[in-house]
Amino acid sequence: MNVLHIVMSNSFAGIEQHVNELASVQKNKSNISLIVSSNIIGKFDKHLDTKEVKNFGRRSIYNIVKLSLLIKNINPDIVHSHGTKTTQIINIVKYFTSFKHVSTIHGIKKNLNAYEKADLVIGVSSKVVANLNVQSKVVSNWWSPMMNGNSDIKTNEYALSVGRLEKVKGFDLLIKGWRNINSNLVIIGSGKEYKELKSLIYNY
């Protein structure tokens, strides 16, 4: 079976790492290809068959046609889109070529219209797919971290929070809210907010 994963992002974060790990496992049983944005292609497993495209908007007809031709050349049985924008683009591509479309929702979405045009939707929790009017399946997220070996953890009893250290994730609110909780909190992740969060922890 030929499976094609498509990710069109500007940064290599949670979704992208998920796809990289998923494809790396799937390649042992299926023919796996990836199409990813040119600015993140270097982050993916070098042993994967990865094609790069310029990240473009969902209204760029020229780039959608180019993507359609690339997909047609790969000739996948299944196209697996990740993220709302990518799913919307694949919904258009389906007018130009034929394949089964699987899409993964990586978080709670208010507008599910794009996902309901897929043949199957995978959600990371039952809550994510609860309101979908299309065949769906829950596959929980896994975690396969690459630790750098540095750790300040001095106890076996702690609360753990893992994620991308960006403002949108709200780790600053978590740290502030943890001030009066009598338990250790460990945060694992990387991102632009690392220094600010480290400073916030010391100040508290």
Q: Can you name each region flagged by the protein language model?
A:
Residues 12-16, 145-146, 162-171, 181, ...:
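A short, basic/aromatic alpha-helical/loop segment that forms part
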Residues 60-63, 81-87, 105:
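Short His-centered aromatic/hydrophobic patch
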Residues 4, 151-169, 173-186:
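Conserved donor-binding/catalytic core segment of Leloir-type glycosyltransferases
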Residues 138, 142-157:
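Acidic anion/phosphate-binding donor-loop and adjacent secondary structure
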Residues 197-204:
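Nucleotide-activated donor-binding/catalytic signature segment of Leloir-type glycosyltransferases, i.e.
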Residues 35-41, 162, 184-197:
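Glycosyltransferase donor-sugar binding loop
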Residues 5-65, 70, 193:
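N-terminal strand-loop element at the rim of the active site
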Residues 95-130:
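A conserved, positively charged/aromatic
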